[in-house]
Amino acid sequence: MSERTSADDGAIEAILDTLARTAPEIRAGLVGRREYVEAANPSGEDQLAADVHADQLLEDRLLAIGDVGTYVSEERPDTIEAEDGGDLSVAVDPLDGSSNIKPNNTMGTIVGVYDTPLPARGRDLVAGVYVLLGPITTIVAAVDGTVTEYVVDDGDRHTAREDVSLPDEPTVYGFGGRVPDWTAEFTEYAREIESDTSLKLRYGGAMIGDVNQVMTYGGVFAYPTLESAPEGKLRLQFEANPMGYIVESAGGKSSDGERSLLGVEPDDLHDRVPVYLGNAGLIDRLEAAVDGGK
């Protein structure tokens, strides 16, 4: 993981404050923006009006921070450069889980702060952040190997928990993708997890909410390799790297099935990757199960 400078410290604080101020606007903007627009993002997914609105807000606000030089979004094909920006690059999933807007379930924003041009490895992150729009709005930020949870109230952030770590005794799991599309190796692993009576299924259709369950209760989240998508479904720069950075900073592990997500070398801004996150023992078992099929 990248070493921070004193300039980075101030920039990260500014980014967190900006995300706190913007979160109420993103939440308020969901009302009346539940319909699809006639456009798709670079991954081929139909865009909701809420996706576009959140993306525009975040671009405007984050690029206004002097130390941020580049804005990259899951919703856009290319990077956006600030006219007089600094050396930090932000990679954003503006509204992770936006398909949950129709049933009014959890969603939020994922942000990776890199100190190098994108695409980049997760090892080049200086911060990983997610903003959870649940019954209350919270921010979970990993900075310099330490995870802090904030509660957002009227655009201000207040520390709720410091030195957040995954509980030693995991109790939840959540697996994405259609079950018939899982590989034989992952299916076997999933059946072992399901047979463990100490673990309960918690899957809500938004990575941000499902990983927050793991951060709160301990466990494992997976959006695995699929027969129809061997490269995985989640985006490395915008989702996998920041969330992997947070989970690892909280004492857990991340994996693409072979190695830490933070060590995956990207080829493109919108690369996809299998994602496995959680307590170390559960991820070790996953890697052993997946490797056994090779």
Predicted regions and their residues:
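N-terminal, Lys/Arg-enriched amphipathic/low-complexity engagement segments
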Residues: 29, 35-36, 41-62
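IMPase-like, lithium-sensitive Mg2+-dependent phosphomonoesterase catalytic core
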Residues: 2-30, 55-294
